[in-house]
UniProtKB/Swiss-Prot annotation:
GO CC terms: cytosol; nucleus
Listed GO MF terms: copper chaperone activity; metal ion binding
Signal peptide bounds: none
Annotated keywords: Chaperone, Copper, Copper transport, Cytoplasm, Ion transport, Metal-binding, Nucleus, Transport
Family: Belongs to the ATX1 family.
Entry coiled-coil feature ranges: none
Record's protein name: Metal homeostasis factor atx1
Compartments reported by the entry: Cytoplasm; Nucleus
InterPro entries: Copper_transport_ATOX1-like (IPR051881), Heavy-metal-associated_CS (IPR017969), HMA_dom (IPR006121), HMA_dom_sf (IPR036163)
Protein's UniProt keywords contain Lipid metabolism: no
C-alpha cells in the first residue's frame, strides 16, 4: 500500500525524526519533504499504524490518504 500524509515539519530535524521512527517500524520505501510538508510511504503496514508512528514524533499529521 502507498500512503500520503500532510505533516507539519519545520526543519531537517523534523524530517530526520520521522525517518528514524518509520525505519524502526520497518518502512524502507519512503519520501519525506519538508518543503511540501509531505510524507509518502509504501509499506505492507496498516495505515493507522503508520499514522500513529509519525504522530509519536510529536509532529501534527494534518491529513492523510491511501494512494494505492
Amino acid at each position: 500500500m502507498k500512503y500520503q500524509f500532510n505533516v507539519a515539519m519545520a526543519c531537517d530535524g523534523c524530517k530526520n525524526a520521522i525517518d528514524r521512527v518509520l525505519t524502526r517500524l520497518g518502512v524502507e520505501d519512503k519520501s519525506i519533504s519538508v518543503e511540501k510538508q509531505e510524507v509518502i510511504v509504501t509499506t505492507d503496514k496498516p495505515y493507522e499504524l503508520v499514522e500513529q508512528t509519525i504522530k509519536k514524533t510529536g509532529k501534527e499529521v494534518r491529513s492523510g490518504k491511501v494512494l494505492e
